[in-house]
């Protein structure tokens, strides 16, 4: 997850580029998996804008989400992985197969609390796009953005609003 001040929160990595600017966040949670808690408004009175990292283009943002008083967690296959014989193996494991799921590159879940969003981002990743989004749609307190294996973005219906911006 990238923040408007170019702060990247990636899996297992937290770098502050403009340290003092981050003090504007009313709350902040620096979990190991790309977790954020945003509260209040920025210094201009606007909603915070959180950027979702492009899982295949380091340093680029694939979508921007305007958020207020919420928690955000992202799970992906792009930080903790290795490639062997052309197959990407990563730290998220499907318990049914014992393998790393390959249909999704990244899942960002938005909800009321960070513990839930962190757990659900991993669940949706393992479930895949179709079943994962069905699950999210059945939970009125959650929204999600999924980047599939083809780089396509899938949004829950709660995020299909005019303020959502994506890379073309």
Task: Please report, for each region that a protein language model flagged, where it lies by residue.
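Alpha-helix boundary/capping motif
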Residues: 4-17, 21-25
């Amino acid at each position: 997850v990238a923040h408007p001040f170019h702060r990247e929160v990636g899996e297992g990595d937290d770098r502050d580029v403009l340290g003092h600017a981050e003090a504007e966040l009313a709350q902040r949670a620096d979990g190991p998996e790309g977790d954020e808690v945003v509260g209040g408004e920025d210094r201009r009175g606007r909603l915070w804008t959180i950027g979702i990292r492009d899982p295949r283009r380091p340093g680029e943002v694939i979508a921007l989400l305007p958020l207020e008083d919420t928690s955000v967690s992202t799970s992906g296959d792009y930080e903790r992985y290795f490639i062997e014989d052309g197959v990407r193996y990563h730290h998220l494991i499907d318990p049914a197969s014992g393998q790393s799921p390959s249909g999704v590159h990244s899942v960002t879940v938005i909800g009321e609390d960070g513990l839930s969003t962190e757990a659900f981002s991993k669940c949706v990743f393992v479930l895949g796009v179709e079943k994962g989004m069905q699950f999210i749609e059945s939970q009125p307190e959650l929204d999600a953005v999924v980047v599939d294996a083809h780089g396509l973005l899938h949004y829950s219906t709660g995020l299909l609003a005019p303020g959502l911006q994506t890379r073309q």
